[in-house]
Amino acid sequence: MGEVQREKVAVIIGPTAVGKTKLSIDLAKALNGEIISGDSMQIYRTMDIGTAKVTKEEVDGIPHYMVDIKNPEESFSVAEFQERVRKHIREITERGKLPIIVGGTGLYIQSVLFDYQFTDDAGDAIYREQMEKLALERGVEYVHKKLQEVDPESAERIHANNVRRVIRALEIFHTSGEKMSDQLEKQENELLYDVSLIGLTMDREMLYDRINLRVDIMMDQGLLEEVEGLYNRGIRDCQSIQAIGYKEIYDYFEDRVSLEEAVSQLKTNSRRYAKRQLTWFRNKMDVTWFDVTDGEKTSEILRYXEGKLQLKSNNSK
């Protein structure tokens, strides 16, 4: 029997503000592709500026998926992301197009590409409610500390403000006696697709300057008003507003900090997140990195993807 043909998928990863969006559009045009967002926060409607969603002008006719599919008060899991994205990959492939995942959120992308099994077996609604109550009464740091005690690897990977994932990891340990980190390590480490993993990186100081500038531009574009709209709708304690760009401005509306302090914290958190993104991708995935410090490498990256996936670009026809 011949080997089953695996679906071809291009994946563009890298830290925030490095230039993934433009590259993804350029590759989609050249390789007859359609784009799937690999960002866990771009799924939320009305959260456009803070999540740096692709604009109507930038889209330039290229279909985009996994954007604006949930309301901000709704929750969203890695398992649901995995299911939806794999469905999009099938459908895009069936149309004779190339799926291009762009992100973003390391665990989410990894869950799609590798044989991660998410089941409802490890679930305890009563325990989950107890942990949620603890998080509200004693703070997210308290619950995160409990996770550090039983599963330090997951605690290192999951930020304290990501309360849902912290509690999920605790719930898995509570019900199965196994660490979430151990469960993930045990799972099959083989790619499910024929993947071209493209990573963008640049000089750290330049990246940090770009991040600071991006925050200033977001404020000019109306980030304050965008967050105020969510705040005035009464959206509190939701997964969506834990996103960088929202929690900092929420602190301003809660009179915890001045606007200047909120913007400064947003820049700091964005830079830290970029560093965490790079660390994650370098440790968890076999990525071919392209340094774009001195400018775009679109032609070079296009040649690499053509070769890796054995494709012919529209540019070479």
Curated annotation (Swiss-Prot):
Region Interaction with substrate tRNA: start-end pairs: 39-42
Site location (Interaction with substrate tRNA): T105, R128
Example GO molecular function: tRNA dimethylallyltransferase activity
InterPro entries: Dimethylallyltransferase, IPT, P-loop_NTPase
Enzyme class: transferase
Binding site for substrate: T16, A17, V18, G19, K20, T21
Binding site for ATP: G14, P15, T16, A17, V18, G19, K20, T21
Cofactor(s) needed by this chain: Mg(2+)
Assembly and interaction partners: Monomer.
Task performed by this protein: Catalyzes the transfer of a dimethylallyl group onto the adenine at position 37 in tRNAs that read codons beginning with uridine, leading to the formation of N6-(dimethylallyl)adenosine (i(6)A).
Similarity-based family: Belongs to the IPP transferase family.
Protein name: tRNA dimethylallyltransferase
Organism the protein comes from: Bacillus cereus (strain AH820)
